[in-house]
Structures are given as structure tokens and as C-alpha cells.
């Protein structure tokens, strides 16, 4: 069993990432920001392709939480923005989307008014009306449709997220999945994902527990607190035996469904003895941690008294397994607890046979550090099998660009207005600047080096055999009339001064779709594991990519319907295709 803290940087440099079960990641060495990260898999059984995408994530810059300092298991959520102060819980507040991007209200038009009033969703009618407001990320990258539904009574609000792959996510439909002020139900700070459904009728249902006073000494500084705001992930159920097209939560707050799989997050209710398989049903009240703490960034107290002690995977096949709830796998978490700060120090995976027999545990933490090198230059000791190759600074720069640097960098490259303070902070945090008040020359040089590192990191990725990619643009704006003319002049050569993001899989619906043909030797690269948004395929091109306009197919022309039918669009909704006014066929010039 390995203790995480206490290693010197020299020791960490020699440690190889552990080989984890499928779905897990490894130790990531700290970059210029000084942050290290680890990802541990949860014992999640594969279903018919639709299982919860959850894992334990560690960041050395993370705060305290239900898994100890630095660790988290975040589900999809939407929250009010707090970086500019405490939310006012009115129309002046800003929201943060599931990817952390600020949300803005979608423009209202005559064809698509925003907001609208709804009494139903599909074939499901509601007993009241809802005001539905569409939002989108301020910087578009995920291409989902986001709707904020507000009912007639206080606290009766939730979010719908229509993913680009057709999956529908429901967030905060019931009070159990909303983090709100206990004294004001309408003051909701976070909406947690509560249900997801695929076009094939496969569902995932998330259950949460509210904080309470169980096993808490309610005297002293704990007296008089209202601790009911916090929500803990309790169960994730999936593998519904019978497919259903509609969300279960439309008609019931507690769906009565036959689930085949349940992932249980246990906070001490079922016992943590590794020799005793825990039961499916909680046997006791949950345990209290030694280092309770509170958060106040939303304007009310969010008190945390719990630690997740284990994660359990149950199967429900009574005819095949002989019992209703069969434990198959268990991630047992062990902590170094004290009243000051609790740290996760060990994570063991245990597997169980159908008769309850426990297989030998798998240690998921890092292997012990290798012995120190021999003195006196003796090189007879074999090389440590834990030695690894560090990730290059160029790949680190590309990874950060994909996560949050793309907006600033591309605005700078295009000569648009950009947040200079944010740019300086980025360069400072990535060690491209040594001061937050550089001269103009120092700033330009640092930006040049940073952009060059991103480009070199991109060029180091493997080439692919893709021959066509897509890009959606919104050019039908008065301010972009000159740009539209450039893109609609056959034979014209467009030079994109910024990094150009494209999709090899889907044509994102907008008024203009670029059908971009590639030749062997092009400089575009699939980001793959380097990408921050793992769910989407992205081919990125370096700055100053040249594209030649070969043909334009306008809406209403003879070839438009034929070419449109050949495109794989980002949304199957036929109404959205009316937004497409033109398809521009162009080719990347390698020279």
C-alpha cells in the first residue's frame, strides 16, 4: 500500500504510471503550472454501449471534498458563476455549462423565438406551463442544445441538454438533484445530472443523498447549522431491461424500473471490512468525517460531513445468478483521517464470484519508489522498470490550448480584440513569462514562443489518412459581409491566420458548411488523447493554413439537396437544416 504524499520531485520523476484496469489513466507529471493529476477507474460494468462515464480524478491543485483533498468524482452539472461574486439569484447571474464555459442566451429570431412557453415535451404533457430559454456556450466547442426550463412555482426549474450524438440529459428535475439554499428553494446554485436517455431508449439514472446530522456531534460549533444543502452521489442505475424513449422523470420522481446494473457510492452505511462483502441495502447510517468543512461561495452554507468509503458494482440478474442483487466488484478507499485534513492514501479493487468468494485485491495506487542509485558510479544495478519519458513542453502547450487557451490565442492571431490580462496570466502560469507586467516586446516574444510550441506539439502528432473534414461558420452577419464575399468567390485562396478546428466526422449545422478536401501531406492532426474534450473528434490545423475555394452550392440550387444528403450532420432535427444556406467545397493547399 502506497502513501501518496512524502515523495521528492526527484523520486516522482522516476516513477512510472501504474498499469490500471481498463478505463483508468495514470500519473501525469506536473507541467509549468506545477499541478500533477491521477485518474483512477471505478468498477463500472460495461453495458450495451451506454454506461456512466465516471472516474476518480486527482489534481494537486484541487480542494477538499467527499474523497479527501484533491480528489473528485464529478457528474455533469450546471452552476451559477461565482468568480465575479456571490450570485444574486436573478436575471443578472451567469451560468457555467457542463464544460465550465460561460453560457449566454441564444439570440431570439422570428423563426426561433427565445424564450418560449411549453406545455409538453414530445408526447409527454405537463400539468403546468414552463418558460424555456435556450442557452449556448460563450465559446462554442461542444455543439449541444441547452434549455433552461422554469415552472410557475419557486424552485421548479431544471435544464435539458441535447447532446450532438442524440443523447438527452436532464439536470436538476427534482429537489434531490439541486444544490439550493435551504432557506430559499428558488436560490438554486447547481443543477446535477439526474437522468440520461439515448435515441435507442437506454437510460442512466442518478440518485443523490442530502447531508444531515447523522453521527454528527451537534454541540459546540456544529449547533444551529442548517446542513441540508449538500448533495452526495449515491447510486447510478443503468441497463433498463425495457427500452423507453421518454425520460422516466417526466412522469415520476422515483422511477419504478427494472435496472440490470447499479453503481453504489457508500459513505460507511454498509461496512468497510475488506473480508465482508457489503450488502446492496444500507445497514447503518453513514459515518461522519473527522474534518468537516463548509463552502460559502454561493451565499449560503454548504456543510460536508461525509467521505466516500467505497464504490460498489452490483448486477441484477436473479434468474441467472440466483439472487436479486449480486456484488461483482468493489473499490475500497482508505484515508489518512485527522481533524485538520483528510487524504486518500489507498484504493484497492476487489472482485467477487457469484458465491461471494473474494478475489485477491488489486492495488490501484502508485508502485513504491525504486531504491536510490548506487554510490560511487556503480552502474551494475539494472535500470528501474518504472522509468518513463516525460511529456514534452510542446504537447503540454497543445493540451492547455485545447482545454482553455484556444479563444485567447486565436483572437490574438486574427488581430481581434482579446483579453490581454488573461493572455498574460496564461503565459505567466505556463512559464512563458516571468512577470505579470511585461514590456510589449517581452509579451510579443512570449506569445510567439507559446504559439510555436503549440504548433510543434501539433506537428508531432501522427498523420492520418482522412481526405475530407468539415467546418461550420456563421457568415450571414452584416459585419461579416466582406468575409462572406471572400468565401463565396470561386478560385479565391483563404488564409486562416489562427489555428483552424475541423471535424472529420460531422458537419456542424450553421448557415455555411465548409466541405474541406485534403491531400496527402497536409498538416492537420487529430488531437485524440491530447484533446481536452474527449468525446469529440477534432482535426486541428496550424496557423496560416491556405484553402482554395473550388465551388459553392447555394440553398435552392439544383445540386444543393443532393450534396446536403451526403453530409453527416451534427443534428438529425430536420428543422435545423433550414439554417444551412450554402455548402462551400474547398481544398487545403499544402504549399
UniProtKB/Swiss-Prot annotation:
Domain spans labelled TR mART core? 373-576
Top-rank EC class of the record's enzyme:
transferase
**UniProt-recorded Gene Ontology molecular function terms:** NAD+-protein-arginine ADP-ribosyltransferase activity; nucleotide binding; nucleotidyltransferase activity; toxin activity
| Chief localisation class | secreted
Which EC number(s) are documented for this chain?
2.4.2.31
The family annotation for this protein states: Belongs to the SpvB family.
Please identify the protein, giving its name as recorded.
Answer: Mono(ADP-ribosyl)transferase SpvB
Q: Which organism is it from?
A: Salmonella typhimurium (strain 14028s / SGSC 2262)
- What phylogenetic lineage does the species belong to? Bacteria, Pseudomonadati, Pseudomonadota, Gammaproteobacteria, Enterobacterales
Q: Which gene encodes it?
A: spvB
